[in-house]
Amino acid sequence: MTTLASSISERYIGLMSGTSLDGVDGVLVDFSGPRPMLLTDAYVPFPPALRQAFFDLQSAGHNEIHREALAANALADLYAECVAQLLHESGCDPREVRAIGAHGQTIRHQPGEHDGIGYTRQTQHAAVLAERTGIDVIADFRSRDIAAGGQGAPLVPAVHRALFALPDAWRVVCNIGGIANLTVLPPQQSDARDRVLGFDCGPGNALLDYWVHAHRGEAYDRNGEWARSGWIDAALLETLRSEPFFARMPPKSTGRDLFNPTWLQQQAGDTLERIRPEDVQATLLALTADTIADAVRTHAPRTASLVVCGGGARNGALMQRLAAQLPGTLVAASDDFGVPAHQVEALAFAWLARQCVRREPGNVYHATGAAGPRVLGTIYPA
């Protein structure tokens, strides 16, 4: 068993299960050097029943407190399995790991722009994870930022800056999970170097995954091939892009609370029945790519490159559409810059755990809109 007080290790584990509801990404990271060193990574897929349980918990339903507790327990089992894989593959003893940063599964995100302090819920059973692994667990990273008047998101800009910022050029990092978010990184040798901007810009894979599952029974559209087989419906795309969220200025955040099947049905109406399903898929892909590109043009018009991470980086059709929408900007997956696309967010939560252990702020407060820098996370000692 290891404790925050007794350990001097700079090794941390980060665990992330995002709004795509596909599974758990885990990384073991060593922070003892000038840059984070990824020692190993692991992935544990969600069983279909758990994926459905989390999807159902994103809207009101019967006996949801009980159902959330069961889902949180099941997630703790998957997190513990992911930790076991990381330790086994690296040969690392649990006592050598300072702490685990566990994000949990977002089921509600209401930062409260209109009625005071809001809330966010990343369900998990961190106490069970600490018990199973014998390692201190840091969880609930977003609540403190919201308590300070922020959006609770995005929490990854500081890590994006450490990994991807350029000395003499603007760069944008885009994480495309269920929701897409941007980090705008100024040149680090300029007077603007501290003006890091981060915000959610709209749907990522969430609507694409929903539509392909509803019509083909597949968890996701591999490489965007089904979307490639369809035609973009210009009228539907224009209707979807009329959503007021897209025009709002940062700081802003969103989730499946907004961009969900109900929203799609309300926006599109009977168009979903009149055109081919693959045409809807093509249009949803264009919605994701075009709203990301709009945000880049608006908030980082001088950017030299767009670094894409998350599951969307593996969607060739989506990456192609992004590049077409941003001529003159290099669009590439984070793998091309030395960090595998699926590891970036998990690495961020390892870093946030380290910040909490060191009692140092984890939020970029001018990106989230919080009143100031805050130490994020709740500690569950082993």
UniProtKB/Swiss-Prot annotation:
<dbReference type="GO" id="GO:0016301">
    <property type="term" value="F:kinase activity"/>
</dbReference>
<keyword id="KW-0547">Nucleotide-binding</keyword>
<dbReference type="InterPro" id="IPR005338">
    <property type="entry name" value="Anhydro_N_Ac-Mur_kinase"/>
</dbReference>
<feature type="binding site">
    <location>
        <begin position="18"/>
        <end position="25"/>
    </location>
    <ligand>
        <name>ATP</name>
    </ligand>
</feature>
<dbReference type="GO" id="GO:0005524">
    <property type="term" value="F:ATP binding"/>
</dbReference>
<comment type="pathway">
    <text>Cell wall biogenesis; peptidoglycan recycling.</text>
</comment>
<dbReference type="InterPro" id="IPR043129">
    <property type="entry name" value="ATPase_NBD"/>
</dbReference>
<dbReference type="Pfam" id="PF03702">
    <property type="entry name" value="AnmK"/>
</dbReference>
<dbReference type="GO" id="GO:0006040">
    <property type="term" value="P:amino sugar metabolic process"/>
</dbReference>
<keyword id="KW-0119">Carbohydrate metabolism</keyword>
<dbReference type="GO" id="GO:0097175">
    <property type="term" value="P:1,6-anhydro-N-acetyl-beta-muramic acid catabolic process"/>
</dbReference>
<comment type="similarity">
    <text>Belongs to the anhydro-N-acetylmuramic acid kinase family.</text>
</comment>
<protein>
    <recommendedName>
        <fullName>Anhydro-N-acetylmuramic acid kinase</fullName>
        <ecNumber>2.7.1.170</ecNumber>
    </recommendedName>
</protein>
<comment type="pathway">
    <text>Amino-sugar metabolism; 1,6-anhydro-N-acetylmuramate degradation.</text>
</comment>
<comment type="function">
    <text>Catalyzes the specific phosphorylation of 1,6-anhydro-N-acetylmuramic acid (anhMurNAc) with the simultaneous cleavage of the 1,6-anhydro ring, generating MurNAc-6-P. Is required for the utilization of anhMurNAc either imported from the medium or derived from its own cell wall murein, and thus plays a role in cell wall recycling.</text>
</comment>
<keyword id="KW-0067">ATP-binding</keyword>
<keyword id="KW-0418">Kinase</keyword>
<dbReference type="GO" id="GO:0009254">
    <property type="term" value="P:peptidoglycan turnover"/>
</dbReference>
<dbReference type="GO" id="GO:0016773">
    <property type="term" value="F:phosphotransferase activity, alcohol group as acceptor"/>
</dbReference>
<keyword id="KW-0808">Transferase</keyword>
